[in-house]
Regions:
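N-terminal glycine/serine-rich phosphate-binding loop of ATP-dependent small-molecule kinases
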Residues: 1-78
Length: 78
C-alpha cells in the first residue's frame, strides 16, 4: 500500500542546519529551511552549540514545514 505521508528530516551541522520535508511515497522534496547553527563562545574562547537558540529555530522550521506540507507529516528523523 502506498505511503501518502511526509517525513521531516533534521540535519544539524557545525556550520548550518537543514530541516527538510520529503514525501514518503517518492522522496520528493516538499519544503526546506536552512539556517546558521547557533553557537555560544565562552570567555575562554570555547565554542559550543547554543542549544536554546537551535531548538527554537528547529521548532519553528518543523511548524512551518508541517503547516505547508500537502501531505500529513507522520515522521521526524534526526
Amino acid at each position: 500500500m502506498p505511503d501518502n505521508s511526509a517525513a521531516i528530516v533534521i540535519d544539524i551541522g557545525t556550520t548550518n542546519c537543514k530541516v527538510t520535508c520529503f514525501s514518503c511515497l517518492d522522496a520528493t522534496t516538499l519544503g526546506a529551511h536552512k539556517f546558521v547553527t547557533a553557537k555560544q563562545i565562552s570567555p575562554q574562547g570555547d565554542v559550543d552549540f547554543d542549544i536554546d537558540a537551535l531548538w527554537q529555530e528547529v521548532r519553528q522550521a518543523i511548524a512551518q514545514l508541517n503547516a505547508a506540507s500537502p501531505l500529513p507529516v507522520r515522521r521526524i528523523s534526526i
